[in-house]
UniProtKB/Swiss-Prot annotation:
Gene3D superfamilies cross-referenced by the UniProt entry: 3.30.70.260, Chorismate mutase, Periplasmic binding protein-like II
Domain named Prephenate dehydratase: residues: 97-272
GO CC terms in record: cytoplasm
Binding site for substrate: 11, 28, 39, 57
Provenance organism: Stutzerimonas stutzeri
Name assigned to this protein: Bifunctional chorismate mutase/prephenate dehydratase
Keywords carried by this UniProt record: Amino-acid biosynthesis, Aromatic amino acid biosynthesis, Cytoplasm, Isomerase, Lyase, Multifunctional enzyme, Phenylalanine biosynthesis
Compartments in which it is found: Cytoplasm
Domain ACT: 284-361
Gene responsible for this protein: pheA
Pathway: Amino-acid biosynthesis; L-phenylalanine biosynthesis; phenylpyruvate from prephenate: step 1/1; Metabolic intermediate biosynthesis; prephenate biosynthesis; prephenate from chorismate: step 1/1
Gene Ontology molecular function: chorismate mutase activity; prephenate dehydratase activity
Site keyed Essential for prephenate dehydratase activity: positions: 265
EC number assigned by the record: 5.4.99.5, 4.2.1.51
Length: 365
């Protein structure tokens, strides 16, 4: 058989497979519509039916990855199913999601990675505004950055948890790649100013010192804002990601300029609904201890003695008084698990205040 005949036969087979895939996706979408009908009919009329279930989404994606036999890798297969699930959920109830804007930020990329591209995304000017939108019920969920592998905790987010009564419903980790972007009219040999968010400038400090040591570095509210500015300036460049480059029509003068090759940011999904256990969860808490010697040791001992893994601990000044502090702690497990429940009870007896921010599925993607 000639090469042309072989290719023709393969394309006919691919076309047939595409038709089968189309039929199955359509059947899945009709099932999603039926789920919406059943939930709406049985839900109390005074309340809005809940269609998005974080624990169910996490289980489906993990199940798909367990069943996958290749040649696509597990994450790529999960991303495909994430988009199918996002589209089907939009038939039931389009999700409204707030994130730290403007368009083109890593926060938007994190929102789309977690919820898929069928959500109604709403950019906000500040992290606190994302919290306020969720508390007010203007959106179903918010996406906020909480820590970076290079620069550490995002203090604006931690402080917002002290001010708002809100639930953590999930997490998403995003690999961060920074590029040096320029516009069509930029004279690349005459760049005198580089815009970016302060954290991004810090994450690319060594590269900038080596390649643009005498160029002014200007911190702005977001990388997307940096990209917008560069579009209209001939003597400036921006440090931002792929989404901002595509959105604002910029070219990459240099790619992946972050100082550390493994540079990622963790984002939290905030909302109002408690998430049931999945068997692979994290719990986030805020604790305020009495100001006395050994307070931190006393706080951590119940976790250690019960073999519970702590994945993060941060300290922030308390708003209640001078020289008092609160601890933000993430641990493995769900607050309904008997072991975690017992530890929290022990801590609660010694703490000035203890608040469970939420238990949620560990990031799948």
């Amino acid at each position: 058989m000639s090469e042309a005949d072989q290719l023709k036969a393969l394309r006919v087979r691919i076309d047939s497979l595409d038709e089968r895939i189309l039929d199955l996706i359509s059947e899945r979408a009709r099932c999603a519509q039926e789920v919406a009908r059943v939930k709406t009919a049985s839900w109390p009329k005074a309340e809005e039916a809940v269609f998005y279930r974080p624990e169910r989404e996490a289980w489906v994606l993990k199940h798909i990855m367990e069943l996958n036999k290749g040649p696509l890798d597990n994450e790529e297969m999960a991303r495909l199913f994430r988009e199918i699930m996002s589209s089907c959920l939009a038939l039931e109830q389009p999700l409204r999601v707030a994130y730290l804007g403007p368009e083109g930020t890593f926060s938007q990329a994190a929102a789309l990675k977690h919820f898929g591209h069928s959500v109604i995304s709403k950019p906000m000017a500040a992290i606190d505004e994302v919290f306020r939108e969720v508390v007010a019920g203007a959106v179903n969920f918010g996406v906020v950055p909480v820590e970076n592998s290079t620069e550490g905790a995002v203090n604006h987010t931690l402080d917002s948890f002290l001010e708002h009564d809100i639930v953590i419903c999930g997490e998403v980790e995003l690999r961060i790649h920074h590029h040096l972007l320029v516009g069509e009219t930029t004279k690349t040999d005459r760049i005198t100013r580089i815009y970016s968010h302060a954290q991004s400038l810090a994450q690319c400090r060594k590269w900038l010192d080596a390649h643009y040591p005498n160029v002014e570095r200007v911190a702005v509210s977001s990388n997307a804002d940096a990209a917008k500015r560069v579009k209209s300036e001939w003597n400036s460049a921006a440090i931002a990601g792929d989404m901002a480059a595509q959105l604002y029509g910029l070219s990459k003068l240099a790619e992946k300029i972050e100082d550390r090759p493994v540079n990622s940011t963790r984002f939290l999904i905030i909302g109002s609904q408690e998430v049931p256990p999945t068997g692979d969860d994290k719990t986030s808490i805020i604790v305020s201890m009495r100001n006395k010697p050994g307070a931190l040791h006393e706080l951590l001992m119940p976790f250690h003695s019960n073999g519970i893994d702590l994945t993060r601990i941060e300290t922030r000044p308390s708003r209640s008084g001078k020289w008092t502090y609160v601890f933000f702690i993430d641990c493995m497990g769900h607050h309904q698990d008997p072991l975690i429940k017992n530890v929290l009870e022990k801590i609660g007896h010694e703490a000035v205040a203890l608040k469970v921010l939420g238990s949620y599925p560990k990031a799948v993607l």
